[in-house]
């Protein structure tokens, strides 16, 4: 496919964690703190929900389900864990979709960010690392996360110590995710005497995600209580 392989391989990078971190940091420190916090909530709570669903559904990647599917090598390197729902689409929706929400009155920015979300989702299908349902479900979940976090942050700001409630809830859910990751049963399928997908490799994504989420919310609560960065 030539140029399209190259182009969409770069587009899909906009749904990776590094781009998310850089964007959140830039917006938080330089553009607008409240907008940065909104993006951070979208990203971290979005990947928390996404990971719960991934290890619950345990759906294999397309090339595992059908040997006729051959993704590009570069895309496969970042396609870790189970397939459903799409993590890249979740990240793209949380960051670029979040920016579309915050800059809704600017039509150019709004539609540019929305198009970027859709392009990342399409790139996951084009590069053959996700099925359409992986992308669509992740997109729908992401929209609910965008809406829910607007309500959640508004609720936090209108009451005393509600930030502690949210922080405690996040710690509890993270602990549940780790316990669930360790204790649940995972499918083990064989082909020609070999394990198709090693469950241990599929579950490793839970741990760094939990550590990132705890670290981010710890920084958030410390800022609210002691630093109050303007």
Question: How would you name each of these model-derived features?
Answer:
Residues 1-6:
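Short, strongly hydrophobic alpha-helical membrane anchors
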Residues 12-13, 37-42, 82-88:
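Short secondary-structure transition/capping motifs
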């Amino acid at each position: 496919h030539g140029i399209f392989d190259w182009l969409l391989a770069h587009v899909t990078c906009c749904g990776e964690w590094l781009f998310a971190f850089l964007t959140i940091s830039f917006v938080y420190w330089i553009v607008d703190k409240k907008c940065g916090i909104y993006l951070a909530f979208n990203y971290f709570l979005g990947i928390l929900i996404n990971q719960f669903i991934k290890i619950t559904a345990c759906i294999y990647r397309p090339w595992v389900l059908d040997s006729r599917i051959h993704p590009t090598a570069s895309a496969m390197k970042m396609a870790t864990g189970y397939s459903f729902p799409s993590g890249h689409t979740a990240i793209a929706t949380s960051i670029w979709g979040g920016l579309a929400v915050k800059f809704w009155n600017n039509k150019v920015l709004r539609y540019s960010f929305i198009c970027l979300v859709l392009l990342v989702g399409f790139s996951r299908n084009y590069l053959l690392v996700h099925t359409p349902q992986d992308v669509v479900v992740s997109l729908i979940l992401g929209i609910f996360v965008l809406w829910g976090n607007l309500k959640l942050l508004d609720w936090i700001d209108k009451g005393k110590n509600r930030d502690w409630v949210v922080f405690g809830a996040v710690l509890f859910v993270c602990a549940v995710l780790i316990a669930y990751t360790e204790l649940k049963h995972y499918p083990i399928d064989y082909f020609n005497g070999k394990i198709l997908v090693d469950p241990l490799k599929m579950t490793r994504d839970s741990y760094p995600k939990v550590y990132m989420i705890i670290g981010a919310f710890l920084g958030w609560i410390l800022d609210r209580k002691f630093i109050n960065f303007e």
